């Protein structure tokens, strides 16, 4: 699952694996969409995967046929969060393994919610007043539009502003939705498939406090 904090990237960002079929969902991105919109799109993907992919592969006589009993769900950044949530929301799909790379799994941390000037990947965002202006201007200009991909270089300044101003999670939660609450989902389901979490200790974009391993998983 493509990620980049639900803001940039697209479904073509994954390389190949031998002896595997790679299926990557395309979903709407922030800030044009909300977290609820993104989850609706991912829900539609899983429904399509289980109802349409097998017949599609058969009708086109693919050399490799999908085996939906052996699903490996991999995602980076926002996509890693979606991979974990997919297993929590759909235990009936029997996802076998999850790989989550530098994903924000726990949102209620100062790193994502409290505005503060900080260096991100060696770059200082614009000053707070200017950053807020850039965010509001982009949201106003893009109102009503739909975006499912974005060039990281084109969106980089906006991402810096959103991170510095602590606005990313508030944009995700414009439409309240229990599907966004990782701890709540895990308490409901009670377990996850085997999970490989990868996160850098010095990650300046999504700090390790967002990974929630000790808060939620253990």
Curated annotation (Swiss-Prot):
InterPro entries: AB_hydrolase_3, AB_hydrolase_fold, Carboxylest/Gibb_receptor. A motif (Involved in the stabilization of the negatively charged intermediate by the formation of the oxyanion hole) lies at residues 7-9. Signal peptide: none annotated. Its EC number is 3.1.1.1. Pfam families: Abhydrolase_3. It is an enzyme of class 3 (hydrolase). Keywords: Hydrolase. This is Probable carboxylesterase clz11. The lineage of its organism: Eukaryota, Fungi, Dikarya, Ascomycota, Pezizomycotina. The gene is clz11.
């Amino acid at each position: 699952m493509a990620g980049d904090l639900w803001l940039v990237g697209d479904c073509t960002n994954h390389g190949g694996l031998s002896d595997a079929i790679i299926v990557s969902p395309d979903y709407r991105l922030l800030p044009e969409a909300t977290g609820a919109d993104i989850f609706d799109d991912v829900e539609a993907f899983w429904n399509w995967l289980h109802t349409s992919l097998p017949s599609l592969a058969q009708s086109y006589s693919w050399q490799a046929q999908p085996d939906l009993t052996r699903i490996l769900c991999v995602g980076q950044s926002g996509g890693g969060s979606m991979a974990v949530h997919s297993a929590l929301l759909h235990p009936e799909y029997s996802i076998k393994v999850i790989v989550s790379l530098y994903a924000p799994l726990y949102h209620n941390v100062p790193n994502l919610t409290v505005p503060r000037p900080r260096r991100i990947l060696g770059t200082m965002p614009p000053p707070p007043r200017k950053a807020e202006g850039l965010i509001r201007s982009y949201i106003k200009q893009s109102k009503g539009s739909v975006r499912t991909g974005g060039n990281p270089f084109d969106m980089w300044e906006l991402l810096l502003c959103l991170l510095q101003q602590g606005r990313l999670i508030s944009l995700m939660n414009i439409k309240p939705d229990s599907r966004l609450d990782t701890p709540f989902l895990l308490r409901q389901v009670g377990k996850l498939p085997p999970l490989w979490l990868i996160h850098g200790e010095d990650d300046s974009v999504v700090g390790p406090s967002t990974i929630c391993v000790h808060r939620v998983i253990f």
